Amino acid sequence: NKADWRRSNVNVLIKKLHETIRAVKPWVKFGISPFGIYRNQKSDPLGSDTNGLQNYDDLYADVLLWAREGWIDYNIPQIYWEIGHKAADYETLVKWWATHSENRPLFIGQSVSNTIQHADPKNPSINQLPRKMALQRAYQTIGGSCQWYASAVVENQGRYRDALVSEYHKYPALIPVFDFMDNKAPGKVRKMKKVWTEDGY
């Protein structure tokens, strides 16, 4: 079966990357940011109630296997759609990934532009950021979110950065614990100084 052969090749690559990183720099965390749909229910009853491109079947990426085997240290699925998307609803996918984290740290990849361009279906006077943040925080298996793309946050599109600073990330956060790698607290920071690049960040 050609599809199985392709998946096997990708699996070998991910496993070898994991083993090499552990052997050379064991403190380095190796994560993946896969496409947001693992499998649709029409391909697998355990898949999500979606209708789109699939990691497993179309991209030959068995992300759940990598997490289950411990070949990746964290997972950031790219759930760039809006709440209410007909083929790939954000809420459906967040719930699906939250229940399929395979005991590895899970963060949600979130599109800044898509979030600010779509109104909250329950409150059309605001964008979807408040509801998306509430959804993520409703699951203990979700450790946070990653914003795509960074310059949209820096440029404060739709006052997105302002909302993060004043509402959702107003307090310093602890570094997520990866106790399957080690359980030692990081050492004290020494000789830290602020350095600005020509880009300003």
Segments the model singles out, each with a brief description of its role:
Residues 52-69, 90-94, 124-138:
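Short, acidic/polar
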Residues 119, 149-157, 194:
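Outer-membrane beta-barrel translocator/channel fold
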Residues 77, 147-150:
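Conserved beta-strand positions
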Residues 24-28, 72-73, 102-106, 141-143:
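Short, well-ordered coil/turn segments that N-cap beta-strands
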Residues 27-51, 79, 93-132:
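Active-site clefts of carbohydrate-active enzymes
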Residues 159-201:
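Pro/Thr/Ser/Gly-rich low-complexity, intrinsically disordered linker/stalk tracts
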Residues 1-71, 80:
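Polysaccharide-binding and catalytic clefts of secreted carbohydrate-active enzymes
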Residues 1-13, 85-91, 158, 163-165:
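Active-site cleft segment of glycoside hydrolase catalytic domains centered on the general acid/base Glu
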